[in-house]
Amino acid sequence: MPFRVVRDCLLLGVLVLPCLAQEEIRIDAAAQSAPFPHFWEQMFGSGRAILSLRESYREDLRAVKQIADFRYVRFHAILDDEVGVYNEDEHGNPVYNFAYVDEIYDGLLLNGVRPVVEISFMPKKLAFNPDALHPFWYKPNVSPPKSMERWDGLMTAFARHLLERYGEEEVAHWYFEVWNEPNIDFWGGVPRQKSYFELYDHTARALKSVSSRLRVGGPATAAAAWVDDFLKHTSEKRIPVDFVSSHGYADDTVENLLGTNEDVSMRDRLCSAVGKVKGQMRAAGKSNLPLLWTEWNVPGMDELRDTAFVGPALADTIRQCDGLADALSFWTFSDVFEEDGPIAQPFQGHFGLRAKGGINKPSYYDFALLHRLGEQRLKNENPNVIVTKRKDARLVIAVWNYVEPGQRGQARSYRLIFEHMGLEAAEIGENRVDEEHGNTLAAYRGMGSPRYPTEEQVRRLNAMTALGTPETVRLSGRSLDLELGPNALVLLEVKPGVPAK
């Protein structure tokens, strides 16, 4: 990627400030374009199923829906004993109860969100090993079923109930994902892969026996594992697969994600793994299937998920994964989340976009900014920019200064040079998230880091850090100079003026 470096040095008295290298980024409004579906905001993860009955969960859902307009939510444990789906009478006969299931899914649909039905975990009375408990705080059972016949019966009854309550036309838009990360300690079957494939086969066939329109898929593995084996197995056995799903995080090891010991930066790992899986799908003749990446997040070290780092990491992931995944599901939209127990206080590095109490994190504002990107992406080879166009002909441009975790970053200076567009009287609006804008963590610390913030404190924090109206910025000729601090994300909305004469 060619660029020109310009040196601007300032002399203040006898102090010479370091020169800041300025990188030129050419923004060509006539560049080749391609459809740009917002795959990063179609789906979010959340805390387990039963938490969705809490008003705090639903408040966070509505808040994130407002800024990202996501369509699907995925969570664990719809079959967990606390949901009460499966029991047995005194004679050992199955007894089903879908009362909480209805409340859970009713709540999602009422707020304009559909479920990704992750079929997990095992009801204790259906478990082959009732003591096979995962170490999560709520101790889900990860055992295979004691009887595949009874499992088939549960799946069939579950699907029939959903169709009776919500209608086939609605439920046909849902996704049914079989289990969660069966390649690690979420699945206790032996041998692990073979027993999971048996579970998948039975589940897919049972669901399809109720309606061929139900969409079922997997393998929902951690670290991009098993996809090639899964596709080979289901093809050979003629088992239905309507989508492929897997997981991967930016701080997963390169060996686990990619099967190599090469030095791959955290910036590049996730989309390299997504690309690997997409390649396996092509090799298996299944590239036509949707690829749902049903869990991902930025690195969790140093509480980065509470900081401005999320913005550049998210934007760069969008840039690299565009065209590879149909949905990239951020884990999670909210810190109403209890895998390690109730969260004690806000800002402890948890996954969500909203901290405990409904505090908007910088990541919340990052998603709000990137939601504004257009429906067409214009070709641009610079690794720190996404250029898009809206239907109203506005250009919407994301620019960022990514700093690799564990490194000290510096400010970066960019000169954006606009080509092939009328710029006389052009209007440019700028919003940004960085250390000074949208930084709720800093505001929270400035408030004394209250362990149990009051509603008024939460209101003040969100008001203090809200993005607000875009700032109007001016061009110098056909160019715009920007300076971005470490891990800054800037969004520009350019309304073209009349062509220059």
Q: What name fits each language-model region?
A:
Residues 7-18:
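Bacterial N-terminal signal peptides
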Residues 192-328, 345-346:
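Noncatalytic carbohydrate-binding groove/subsite architecture in carbohydrate-active enzymes
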Residues 81-85, 124-134, 184-187, 251-257, ...:
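Short acidic/His/Gly/Ser-rich catalytic and metal-binding motifs that mark active-site loops
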Residues 1-5:
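N-terminal secretory signal peptides that target proteins for export/translocation
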Residues 50-53, 185-190, 253-256, 301-305, ...:
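A generic structural signal for short coil/turn motifs at secondary-structure boundaries
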Residues 21-175, 194-223, 237-239, 282-288, ...:
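Non-catalytic accessory regions flanking glycosidase/transglycosidase catalytic cores in CAZymes
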Residues 174-181, 294:
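Short, conserved phosphate-binding/catalytic loop or strand-edge motifs used
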Residues 79, 121-123, 180-184, 220-224, ...:
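Active-site-proximal loop/turn and secondary-structure-junction residues that shape catalytic pockets
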